[in-house]
């Protein structure tokens, strides 16, 4: 699927009437599994990128180059549209332009730019926001940097949990007026908050990790929520599986005694082994087994 087709698929989700729950993806294998399972969308989060690439918690240490290269690997591996959490754009508004250029070239379907002050400021234990003016400048820079008009750019605010609901709405309305394609809110905890956001804005809404009170997909869809991100369980599950397997091997288990491993058939499927064999036969004169 060409980049524009993937971006069109994401736009179709935003223009639709359902609330989609994307697959958390972070490498070539995870995106292929999500694609094979027919998820409509992948989400490449900043926290999961930090885990997968650096083995670090979500502490804003990853670089744009590392993020874009990982996105490029995933885009080559499967045709699933991917929405990338581009954090703060890796600097000021001029850095945001570069971020959009690199992620667009890497094949993402869309990206989010947020207003959290990153990296963490000296002496500040709690998250902080950049000013509304700086946040709007970043959004305008992102929109200006977009070469493919089908690339989805989403303005994200954490104001609900950091400052106030009113501040979140004010920032979102400004991003909407600037021309973003959707609005991403984190920290929304209650229905009355979401309803206030929905009433004050017009664009499709993306929610980050909605709590149990909001985990009603029909209700969310009625409030114009088109994407609800549900955290990053796959990488946690993979980490547990590797830990258990290596622990068993360390304790003397023989490989044939291990349980919970992918079958050879599943490994062939996610590595696209039959396609590699086919290409070997076509281009290298190799007999297919």
UniProtKB/Swiss-Prot annotation:
Mg(2+) binds at residue 85. One of its GO terms (molecular function) is methylisocitrate lyase activity. Substrate binds at residues 47, 156, 232. Its cofactor is Mg(2+). It holds the Pfam family PEP_mutase. It catalyses: oxaloacetate + H(+) = pyruvate + CO2. HAMAP family: OadC. This is Oxaloacetate decarboxylase.
């Amino acid at each position: 699927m060409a980049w524009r087709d993937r971006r069109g698929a994401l736009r179709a989700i935003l223009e639709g009437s359902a609330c989609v729950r994307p697959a958390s993806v972070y490498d070539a294998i995870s995106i292929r599994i999500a694609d094979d399972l027919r998820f409509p969308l992948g989400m490449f989060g900043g926290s999961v990128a930090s885990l997968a690439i650096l083995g670090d918690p979500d502490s804003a240490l990853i670089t744009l180059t590392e993020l874009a290269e990982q996105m490029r690997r995933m885009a080559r591996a499967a045709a699933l549209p991917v929405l990338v959490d581009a954090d703060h754009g890796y600097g000021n508004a001029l850095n945001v332009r570069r971020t959009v250029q690199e992620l667009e070239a890497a094949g993402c379907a869309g990206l989010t730019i947020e207003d959290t002050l990153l990296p963490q400021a000296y002496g500040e234990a709690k998250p902080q926001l950049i000013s509304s003016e700086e946040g709007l400048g970043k959004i305008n820079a992102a929109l200006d940097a977009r070469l493919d008009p089908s690339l989805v750019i989403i303005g994200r605010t954490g104001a609900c949990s950091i400052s106030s609901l009113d501040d979140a709405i004010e920032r979102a309305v400004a991003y909407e007026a600037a021309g973003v394609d959707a609005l991403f809110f984190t920290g929304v905890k209650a229905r009355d908050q979401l309803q206030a956001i929905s009433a004050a804005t017009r664009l499709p809404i993306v929610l980050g990790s909605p709590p149990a009170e909001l985990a009603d997909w029909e209700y969310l869809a009625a409030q114009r929520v088109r994407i609800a991100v549900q955290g990053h369980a796959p990488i946690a599950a993979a980490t547990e599986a590797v830990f258990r397997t290596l622990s068993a091997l360390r304790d003397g288990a023989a490989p044939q005694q291990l349980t919970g491993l992918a079958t050879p058939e599943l490994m062939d499927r996610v590595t696209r082994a039959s396609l590699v064999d086919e290409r070997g036969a076509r281009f290298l004169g190799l007999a297919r087994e």
